[in-house]
């Protein structure tokens, strides 16, 4: 099984996986409007030889079979302040001061 991966022209780090090149017939019209003009990113075999970066291989395969597409959204932004405040360390302000 292969999939064709397209990059969104409207949303950064958003990708659409479909089974066949330029076949968006099973993708909802509203999703395509929000996605913008698809730009071909790559064609990838789904046999497990190559690891997907931000998507689970089995979920992608299941979505392609069930609905004909898989939408990969960007990861949530890192909250560096929250990480800093929750990490133990010597450079934190003393609550007693």
From Swiss-Prot:
Any Pfam family matching the protein: YcgL
Xref: SUPFAM superfamilies: YcgL-like (SSF160191)
Residue span of region Disordered: 74-97
Stretches assigned to the YcgL domain: 1-85
Protein's name in the database: YcgL domain-containing protein CKO_01183
């Amino acid at each position: 099984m292969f999939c064709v991966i397209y990059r969104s022209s409207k949303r950064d780090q958003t990708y659409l996986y479909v089974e066949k090149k330029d076949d968006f017939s099973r993708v909802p019209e509203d999703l395509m409007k929000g996605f913008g003009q698809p730009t071909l990113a790559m064609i990838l075999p789904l046999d497990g030889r190559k690891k997907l970066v931000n998507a689970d291989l089995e979920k992608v395969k299941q979505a392609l079979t069930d609905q004909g597409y898989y939408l990969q959204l960007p990861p949530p932004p890192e909250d560096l302040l929250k990480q800093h405040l929750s990490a133990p360390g010597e450079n934190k302000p003393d609550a007693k001061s």
